[in-house]
């Protein structure tokens, strides 16, 4: 009963950020599709024609696929605005789990409650995962509203974009787990946020090097962001990958990428729980 009350408290604390984030994603998705409807098809072809050679190495699909309405809308799931909104949720909620509570003085009250320390970590992860799912759903819902209200030539099916929304949700869970892990080691909320941002930037640089470096696929595989390819999952939903030690066994990327991200998020959260259960809690300054 006490755990359920804590879950409700966590939802109450996060409800404004979650509501505003969902509204932004729904509105931006509609706006993005509306702007696409204003662009002449020939302009996309001209942009791709004059794009530098390294651009093709940075995109996970063929340029021809980007000329279709589905390819153009798929850019939405890689756009900086949805990424920033989802990162804001992941880093904001993840940093609050331990370090944020210590800094605000709430941790002393929670530790003195009948709940065990492990239970104190369960409520935040319920809110974080639920919020990540709702954010992905909000972006997909905005896509559906846009396709339903904006006139496009040869409009794609809205269900084609579900893999992209799921991949974005998985990335949000992964980033939240990484942030929570850093938060479990600290007592100031801002340091976990900056730390998680630094980890993400390094992962992005490693992925970029792997994409541009000839034969650098193994370098890209060192970055967890290599598993974030919503555009590829939207345009090539049945693309597969052969396992290194089992060359005859192929796994569809839409399952593999999301599994990697969610697993990384859950394992980092589990490590954060282990650290929090065993650490001494400092007095808030």
Task: Go through the PLM ranges and name each one.
Residues 76, 88-91, 127, 131, ...:
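Short alpha-helical transmembrane interface motifs in multi-pass membrane proteins
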Residues 1-26, 285:
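Aromatic- and glycine-rich beta-strand/loop motifs that create alpha-glucan
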Residues 73-100, 197:
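Long, hydrophobic alpha-helical segments
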Residues 6, 14, 31-71, 192-285:
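Terminal transmembrane helical anchor/hairpin motif
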Residues 91-111, 125:
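Transmembrane helix boundary and interhelical loop/hinge segments in multi-pass membrane proteins
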